[in-house]
Amino acid sequence: MSKRLENKKIVVTAAGQGIGRATAIAFNNEGANVHATDINDQTLETLNKEYPNIKVKNLDSTNKKAVEGFSASLNQVDVLFN
């Protein structure tokens, strides 16, 4: 397993299932510091149980104030996968 994304902070939206979930897992496997967002708590909880290194956050990306607050809490992001 390569660690070419080690020390990179990556946000993946819609990460609860499908392409978003697969992408979050792939980035995690490459050593990234992954922050996964979705509006479905259940799928996020499952993702976090299977991959405890992935940080999960219930976030509605259509809510501008919520997104701004989340972004501010992260300080710097290297990659945003939407």
Please place each PLM-identified region on the residue numbering.
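Conserved glycine-rich cofactor-binding loop
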Residues: 9, 14-18
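Conserved glycine-rich Rossmann-like NAD(P)H-binding loop of the short-chain dehydrogenase/reductase
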Residues: 30-46
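Rossmann-fold scaffold of SDR-type NAD(P)-dependent oxidoreductases
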Residues: 13-14, 77-82
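Aromatic pocket-lining residues of Rossmann-like dinucleotide-binding sites
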Residues: 27
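N-terminal Rossmann-fold cofactor-binding loop
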Residues: 14, 37-41, 61
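Structural signature of beta-strand start/N-cap positions in the alpha/beta core
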Residues: 9, 33, 55, 76-78
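The beta1-alpha1 cofactor-binding region of Rossmann-like NAD(H)/NADP(H)-dependent oxidoreductases
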Residues: 57-69
